[in-house]
Curated annotation (Swiss-Prot):
Top-level division of the source organism's lineage: Bacteria
Pfam families: DegV
PANTHER family, per the entry: DEGV DOMAIN-CONTAINING PROTEIN DR_1986-RELATED (PTHR33434), FATTY ACID-BINDING PROTEIN TM_1468 (PTHR33434:SF2)
Name of the protein in its database record: DegV domain-containing protein SPy_1698/M5005_Spy1391
GO MF, any single term: lipid binding
Job of this protein: May bind long-chain fatty acids, such as palmitate, and may play a role in lipid transport or fatty acid metabolism.
Keywords: Lipid-binding
């Protein structure tokens, strides 16, 4: 039996730990628009160039979800397909993936396909994909993989830190005055994905050190006691080191992985930001 794990670019991972003929990974890109320029969030995207373009532009920025056809093409070619999308509260990606699932089953009623709304993005999606890979490599049945990943999702969370809010200001979600104050006072916004998939602000911290302390405080409130962590950062390896050191000082056996944010997550987290997934 052959498997595919399919995500959109709300996931930061570009590949699995080890792909094989039996298990492949497909990432369906969203597109990002800055003024009249369009960037496709695939492996060829120069994220640094995209971010420079964004900061140099005064125009509003937008993202567009993949088409059902793009998902359908990614689904084909495997007996078992597990699909995961960025939270449906922020994007139409989940709906496109659902329409493509229906089309695939019309083409091939014998294929097994399961669709997951991550209710999240970034680091939490990354953790879920890595767990899917682990479960599949155990040789479990399709039904058992679905059962176990569903249970696992109840034990994962997302916390984020924003160092810049240019995009929020440009798109009218924050006033220019608030944006300027945040920049001048070096304020970091600390928030989370709710269990409904919406993003919520938890704390405002002045400076990176206080933001790290706030992050640790919030994950402990959620029930973190040393589980796996995946930190996806936007040009900020320093904060990854600070968070990792603090977690390790409290929970020496914690397994922590880090990586760069995808184009989409960089687009919204902005330079210096992060999206961290963790187990409770």
């Amino acid at each position: 039996m052959t498997w595919k794990i399919v995500t959109d670019s709300g996931c930061d991972l570009r590949s699995l730990t080890r792909q094989s003929k039996e298990l492949r990974f497909e990432r369906v890109p969203l597109t990002l628009q800055i003024g009249t320029e369009i960037f496709r969030d695939d492996d060829g995207l120069d994220i640094d160039n995209m971010m420079t373009t964004m900061y140099q532009s005064s125009k509003a920025t937008t993202s567009s979800c993949p088409s059902p056809e793009a998902f359908l093409q990614a689904y084909r070619g495997a007996d078992n397909v597990i699909v995961m999308t960025i939270t449906g509260t922020l994007s139409g990606s989940h709906n496109s993936a659902r329409l493509a699932k229906n089309e695939l089953l019309e083409e091939n009623p014998n294929v097994n396909i399961h669709l997951i709304d991550s209710l999240s993005a970034g680091g939490e999606m990354d953790l879920l994909v890595l767990e899917l890979e682990r479960l599949i490599k155990l040789g479990l049945s399709f039904e058992e993989v679905v059962k176990q990943i569903t249970a696992y999702q109840q034990k994962t969370r997302l916390i984020f830190v924003l160092a810049k809010v240019d995009n929020l200001v440009k798109n009218g979600r924050l006033s220019k005055l608030v944006g300027k104050v945040i920049g001048l006072l070096n304020i970091r916004m600390v928030g989370k994905a709710s269990n409904k998939g919406t993003l919520e602000l938890l704390q405002k911290a002045r400076g990176q050190k206080k933001a790290v302390s706030a992050l640790i405080e919030e994950i402990q409130k959620e029930g973190y006691v040393g589980g796996k962590v995946y930190i996806a950062h936007a040009q900020n390896p320093k904060i990854c080191e600070q968070i990792s050191e603090k977690i390790k000082s409290l929970y020496p056996d914690a397994v922590i992985q880090t990586g760069r944010t995808s184009g989409l997550c960089s687009f919204y987290a902005e330079d210096g930001g992060l999206l961290m997934g963790y187990e409770i």
